[in-house]
Regions:
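N-terminal acidic leader/helix
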Residues: 1-25
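Short, acidic, Ser/Thr-enriched surface-loop or helix-capping motifs
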Residues: 35
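Short loop/turn microsegments at loop-to-beta-strand junctions
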Residues: 28-29
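C-terminal structural segments of small proteins and small subunits
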Residues: 10, 39-64
Length: 64
């Protein structure tokens, strides 16, 4: 199983949005992320990097 840590970045600040992510769905700028326990978050932005070897996904979050 490939699980990832999702990092969100707004301007210069980067934070962990979710650990142990098992699913990512993208619809335009809406990104839905679900972890292995079924918890789901939704963020607006764009995926900027996916590193499957190191289980990292980086998202530039939209300014709201």
């Amino acid at each position: 199983m490939c699980l990832a840590t999702i990092y969100g970045k707004k301007q210069e600040d980067e934070t962990i949005l979710l650990k142990n992510a098992s699913r990512i769905d993208v619809d335009g700028t809406t990104i839905r992320i679900r972890d292995i326990m079924g918890m789901e978050i939704t963020v607006e932005g764009a995926i900027t990097m996916v590193d499957l070897a190191n289980s990292v996904v980086r998202i530039n979050c939209a300014d709201n």
